[in-house]
Amino acid sequence: MEEENIYPIFDRMLSRKDKEELLGQRGVMLWLTGLSGSGKSTIAIALERELHKRGLLCRILDGDNIRSGINNNLGFSAEDRVENIRRIAEIGKLFVDTGIITIAAFISPGNELRQMAARIIGIEDFLEIYVSTPLVECEKRDVKGLYAKARRGEIKNFTGISAPFEAPEHPALSLDTSKLSLEESVNTLLELVLPIVGKKGEKI
């Protein structure tokens, strides 16, 4: 008996190129990494709005919409943290392969974690953006009161306080929001991203 292809649907689906031509843009992953309170989600939301104004389709993935949904069965053990990032990367790959500009905003504290995400998504489609705002500034902001709880020992293994954060070795871009305004951060990102994703209506 001939070996059956258990994934025959992949051979019949429209290609990534078909979808990118329909959208008039190239799919790419912008992976924002940095400490809690560094400005990742704020930048992601502002960038999405600017890209949307230009007729470009985007999707944000962050802790709120991932942990409350597909990853709501995961905790914060070492194993669960790896699985959290693995699932995010797999979801991100689906969006990127559909031609969507995907913006992921996650602490993702280890280089190995981010390298795993890059391998899943595809190195050529993965732009690592380091939101390098210093700990002292992030702790000063502490909008959710997490740093205060971590200092009191109420939160264990909190990145930057009781757990390490490994700065990216070769990020595509570094943004320190203690020195850059939100507008400056977004404009810097646009300068990086627009030439890569193409403009609506132009051949990509």
Curated annotation (Swiss-Prot):
<keyword id="KW-0418">Kinase</keyword>
<keyword id="KW-0808">Transferase</keyword>
<feature type="binding site">
    <location>
        <begin position="34"/>
        <end position="41"/>
    </location>
    <ligand>
        <name>ATP</name>
    </ligand>
</feature>
<dbReference type="Pfam" id="PF01583">
    <property type="entry name" value="APS_kinase"/>
</dbReference>
<dbReference type="GO" id="GO:0005524">
    <property type="term" value="F:ATP binding"/>
</dbReference>
<keyword id="KW-0597">Phosphoprotein</keyword>
<feature type="active site" description="Phosphoserine intermediate">
    <location>
        <position position="108"/>
    </location>
</feature>
<dbReference type="InterPro" id="IPR027417">
    <property type="entry name" value="P-loop_NTPase"/>
</dbReference>
<comment type="pathway">
    <text>Sulfur metabolism; hydrogen sulfide biosynthesis; sulfite from sulfate: step 2/3.</text>
</comment>
<keyword id="KW-0067">ATP-binding</keyword>
<dbReference type="GO" id="GO:0004020">
    <property type="term" value="F:adenylylsulfate kinase activity"/>
</dbReference>
<protein>
    <recommendedName>
        <fullName>Adenylyl-sulfate kinase</fullName>
        <ecNumber>2.7.1.25</ecNumber>
    </recommendedName>
</protein>
<comment type="function">
    <text>Catalyzes the synthesis of activated sulfate.</text>
</comment>
<comment type="similarity">
    <text>Belongs to the APS kinase family.</text>
</comment>
<keyword id="KW-0547">Nucleotide-binding</keyword>
<dbReference type="InterPro" id="IPR002891">
    <property type="entry name" value="APS_kinase"/>
</dbReference>
<dbReference type="GO" id="GO:0070814">
    <property type="term" value="P:hydrogen sulfide biosynthetic process"/>
</dbReference>
<dbReference type="GO" id="GO:0000103">
    <property type="term" value="P:sulfate assimilation"/>
</dbReference>
